[in-house]
Amino acid sequence: MASAGSGMEEVRVSVLTPLKLVGLVCIFLALCLDLGAVLSPAWVTADHQYYLSLWESCRKPANLDIWHCESTLGSDWQIATLALLLGGAAIILIAFLVGLISICVGSRRRFYRPVAVMLFAAVVLQVCSLVLYPIKFIETVSLKIYHEFNWGYGLAWGATIFSFGGAILYCLNPKNYEDYY
């Protein structure tokens, strides 16, 4: 503390820790992976005869070269999966914007907890959608050929994992780690 007569002022500096920066990168990667998962045409594929995305289901009879596609938005479980996944992605987007704004504005520390809570909420929504999807798919769609959950489904899991990682990084208290920076 400086005396009033010396002309020195007390300046508070908020240091951006690498943990929070890596957390923000995790959130950004989660957003990119969510976008790829939602737009992916391949959540389930089966021997070049069937594919299922969040938006449409297509079949190709073995003896024809024409695909027959229909919207998946007529099925309650597929609408629920899409709503949960998009809800989680929206929360991740809000958390990313809050995290980005907190870096640009000097008061970062007060935004850490809300970002972490939003990310944990998004993880819960996305895990629910990713568990619901294969259970209801196997229950309702009877394929007599080999099928596999494809890269669109994997991207959604990747987004969920990166969101969880970002949430953990935003939970860490930088005061406990000042010696390392």
UniProtKB/Swiss-Prot annotation:
Interacts with CTNNB1, CTNNA1, PRKCI, PARD6B. Interacts with FYB1. It is a multi-pass membrane protein. Expressed in podocytes (at protein level). The modification N-acetylalanine is found at A2. The gene is Tmem47. This is Transmembrane protein 47. Belongs to the TMEM47 family. GO terms for cellular component: adherens junction; cell-cell junction; plasma membrane. Keywords: Acetylation, Cell junction, Membrane, Transmembrane, Transmembrane helix. The keyword S-adenosyl-L-methionine does not apply. Regulates cell junction organization in epithelial cells. May play a role in the transition from adherens junction to tight junction assembly. May regulate F-actin polymerization required for tight junctional localization dynamics and affect the junctional localization of PARD6B. During podocyte differentiation may negatively regulate activity of FYN and subsequently the abundance of nephrin. The keyword Transmembrane helix applies. It is found in: Membrane; Cell junction; Cell junction, Adherens junction. It comes from the Eukaryota. The chain crosses the membrane at residues 21-41, 83-103, 115-135, 152-172. It comes from Mus musculus.
